[in-house]
Structure formats: structure tokens, C-alpha cells
Amino acid sequence: MSKASIKLAFSDKYDHEHSLHYLEKHQDGMARKLSDYRDQQLARRALALAGGPNLVLDLPCGAGRFWSTLAEQPNRIILAADNSADMLATAMAAQPKHITEHVRTLQTSAFDINLPDNSVDSIFCMRLLHHIEKPEHRLALLKEFHRTTRDSVIISLWVDGNYKAWRRKALEKKRARRGRAHENSNRFVINRTTVEQEFIEAGFNIQTHLDFLASYSMWRVYVLRKNN
């Protein structure tokens, strides 16, 4: 299986309209604003733990939700990459100039990154891995990240072993009994031991992890270091 042949089911949906919706949804209501605040906290801490990398590949960058946090380090260059040209255009138009002056854009697939080996200090990958169900696809992604980064990867995903994961599993069983198993079928909870073994197999050491809300939330951020 070639890297270029891997394509996620939702990857073509982000036209201009969907990109605008994606930009707006994380500021829609108090709950999402608080969630975004916590996401930014975790991102800031993970970047510090990774040593404050200067050249960061934000992939997928989406609508630039994390750019203000990434740009807090004045000498940092943000290489913002996404599979969707519309998403990149939306992000550049929406974010203020003092943020975008730190940003260079790149349209590329996360599975086949159009960059040389060891070309960035860190890869910052938020809210992608929980969309990837197949272990072989996750491993292909992680190996491509290992090829491209010189040092670290910051990556978020849904893990098991918490209340939200238990609740989601119960809901999925209920949907299956009602013949509605296909609903929300593009997001997946990953076993912690399984994904940590995949990190190691791809050539990374696990420096640490940060939980959105320990024992309750599925969201976890890992800081990985390249094993040279």
C-alpha cells in the first residue's frame, strides 16, 4: 500500500462552506469556548515540554485554531499544512496579520508529506488520529511523521480508560442494536496500550502525555521524541 493511496472518508468535504463552519464551531457557545481554552492550555504545555521548537509543522492546521498559541514564541515559524486548499485559504483570511506573519502554508496529505526528511523541528497534529480506524493507516501516518520531523511530535487522540470512552462504547452498542451503527463512524476510541505500541513501532519514544480531564475525557495529547 503506497502512502499516497491512503485517503480518509471525510478528507474531501472541506470546501469553502465547510471550512467556514469548522472555523466558527469552536467558538459556538460557552462549553466549546471552555473546551478550546483547555485545548490551548494543553498545546502550550506540550510545546514547552518539546523544548520550544522553532520550526513547527501544524498538520492538519484546519482553520488555524492553534496559531495564536503557536505564535506566542516570537521566533517560531509555523508551517501550516492541510489537505484542503479551501481550509488553508479560510485560515489565512480569518487569522490576524500579526499571527499570519509567522505562517507559511503547504497543501499536502498527512500520509505523504511534501517535505524532505528531517525538515521540521516538531510536528503538531491535533484532532486527526481519532479519525483513523485502521492500525496500518495509523502506523503509516506515524512513520511519515518520523521521516519528516527532526525531533518531536505532539499528537492528540481519543483513548480508552475513562468515563467518556465507556459511555461512548455503551452508546455504540445501543446504536448497533437499533441498526444505526454507521452513525458517527468516522471517529474512534483507541486502546492506550495499542497506540503507545504503535508510537514505539514507528520509531518514537513517549516523553509524556497530557489528559484533557483525567479519568473523564477521552482526549489525550502525547509528546513523542524521535528515537535516532
Whereabouts are the PLM-identified features?
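Conserved beta-strand signature within the Rossmann-like core of class I S-adenosyl-L-methionine
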Residues: 150-158
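Short catalytic micro-motifs in class I SAM-dependent methyltransferases
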Residues: 127-131
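Conserved class I S-adenosyl-L-methionine
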Residues: 1-50
